[in-house]
């Protein structure tokens, strides 16, 4: 966290091999470990929550049903009736990102959503799916979208490359949005936590001054809980929007 008077706020994002020599040879770091943990937690939540409904649902089952209905309604309302076919994908995507965001807030954990390689891979998955669905639903008419309707044909050499570039930038913007928000939040938490420890090492006067950063860190933690859920929602709703455009004829 801090060495002497230096605060290393970016050290938390460094990848280190786990499982000793085996992990080093396989390039198996804490990032895939936390992805596996996130996947297991989501599956466990669904398994426990989606068991045959009791007469009086427990809290976990009630929470699972609320989450199910929320994502289902979002998919159908945004995409249309075709959204039911994409519901499992959107549901999995939302909770995988949400679990990754929240796991990163635990002590000695790792936020895999704070790595651009992970968020870009998720964004490319969404992008490729949207392109495949577009080609299947629209056929050759899909390429007509790169020429704005009503625009003069003479402007095609200028407008078509711009539209293609805008379309290809979707996975980049989608991945950077999640990555940047997670990095910014964790850097702020690390800085104020390190600042608190540095002040606490100054004796009684430092302990009094450290109250301020502690309060700020608690507020930041609450904010990160909100941001973690919000970013998972934004990623999911943008996925729905891209798929809505893909299925539109």
Curated annotation (Swiss-Prot):
Among CDD domains, the record links this protein to: ATP-synt_Fo_a_6
Provide the transmembrane region boundaries. Answer: 30-50, 86-106, 115-135, 142-162, 191-211, 218-238
Q: Which gene encodes it?
A: atpB
Question: What are its GO cellular component terms?
Answer: plasma membrane; proton-transporting ATP synthase complex
The keyword Transmembrane helix is annotated on this UniProt entry: yes
Instruction: Relate the protein's function as given in its record.
Output: Key component of the proton channel; it plays a direct role in the translocation of protons across the membrane.
Q: Which organism is it from?
A: Gluconacetobacter diazotrophicus (strain ATCC 49037 / DSM 5601 / CCUG 37298 / CIP 103539 / LMG 7603 / PAl5)
Protein's name according to its UniProt entry: ATP synthase subunit a
Q: Record's superkingdom? A: Bacteria
Q: Which family does it belong to?
A: Belongs to the ATPase A chain family.
Cite the InterPro entries for this sequence. ATP_synth_F0_asu (IPR000568), ATP_synth_F0_asu_AS (IPR023011), ATP_synth_F0_asu_bact/mt (IPR045083), F0_ATP_A_sf (IPR035908)
Q: Name one Pfam family in it.
A: ATP-synt_A
Recall the GO molecular function terms of this protein's record.
proton-transporting ATP synthase activity, rotational mechanism
Task: Write out the annotated subcellular location.
Answer: Cell inner membrane
Q: Which UniProt keywords apply?
A: ATP synthesis, Cell inner membrane, Cell membrane, CF(0), Hydrogen ion transport, Ion transport, Membrane, Transmembrane, Transmembrane helix, Transport
Q: How does it assemble?
A: F-type ATPases have 2 components, CF(1) - the catalytic core - and CF(0) - the membrane proton channel. CF(1) has five subunits: alpha(3), beta(3), gamma(1), delta(1), epsilon(1). CF(0) has three main subunits: a(1), b(2) and c(9-12). The alpha and beta chains form an alternating ring which encloses part of the gamma chain. CF(1) is attached to CF(0) by a central stalk formed by the gamma and epsilon chains, while a peripheral stalk is formed by the delta and b chains.
């Amino acid at each position: 966290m801090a060495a002497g008077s230096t605060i290393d706020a970016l050290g938390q994002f460094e990848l280190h091999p786990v499982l000793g020599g085996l992990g080093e040879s396989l390039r198996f770091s804490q990032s895939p470990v936390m992805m596996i943990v996130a996947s297991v937690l989501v599956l466990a939540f669904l398994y426990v929550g989606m068991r045959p409904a009791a007469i009086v649902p427990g809290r976990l089952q009630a929470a699972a049903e609320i989450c199910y209905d929320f994502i289902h309604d979002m998919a159908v309302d945004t995409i249309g009736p075709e959204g039911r076919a994409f519901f499992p994908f959107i549901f999995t995507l939302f909770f995988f990102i949400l679990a990754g965001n929240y796991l990163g807030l635990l002590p000695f954990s790792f936020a895999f959503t704070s790595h651009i390689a992970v968020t870009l891979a998720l964004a490319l998955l969404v992008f490729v799916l949207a392109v495949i669905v577009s080609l299947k639903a629209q056929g050759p008419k899909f390429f007509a979208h790169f020429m704005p309707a009503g625009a003069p044909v003479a402007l095609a050499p200028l407008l078509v490359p711009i539209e293609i570039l805008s379309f290809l930038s979707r996975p980049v913007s989608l991945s950077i949005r999640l990555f940047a928000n997670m990095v910014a939040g964790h850097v702020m938490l690390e800085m104020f936590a390190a600042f608190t420890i540095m002040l606490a090492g100054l004796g009684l006067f430092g302990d009094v001054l450290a109250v301020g950063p502690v309060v700020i860190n608690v507020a930041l933690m609450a904010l990160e809980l909100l941001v973690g859920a919000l970013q998972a929602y934004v990623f999911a709703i943008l996925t729905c929007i891209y798929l809505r455009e893909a299925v539109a004829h």
